[in-house]
């Protein structure tokens, strides 16, 4: 039995979304990446002097929300594994944090919340893993995924923006190891088996 889940690495500028298919009939819960999307937004430069900052933030929030909902609806996901952003000391960073929390609150499927440390540990086993280490680990574990690439010195190499997709990927890996997910997956598996047993 397989289900779809989405990993989310949220930020106002780069919102990483990764959809995976998880085999919940296997106690190890192996998963394969089926789709990924990096939704990027920037402050409006053309209208900087004519549009209020909060109006521009609303525009950007809608873009991110629509991207999240598109992936959830397109793949009919069952769970969301989310690296919850932490607060910051600057007012602007806190504003971005609040926007991301608001977008996540609109997620229509059950959400398993994860810390940045949990995600890094799931990816590399190191709490202080660098973005390059996370990207390399994600690419090595999931070569089937459509990672963002560009040409450098005549060779195709991974883009640094894969950082957000790598974090979303390892949010899934961290999430499937939580008691919360394993309990829910077990209930779903038992319900599936019971339903099919009745038909035999």
PLM feature spans:
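Phosphate- and other anionic-substrate recognition elements at nucleic-acid/protein interfaces
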Residues: 1-200
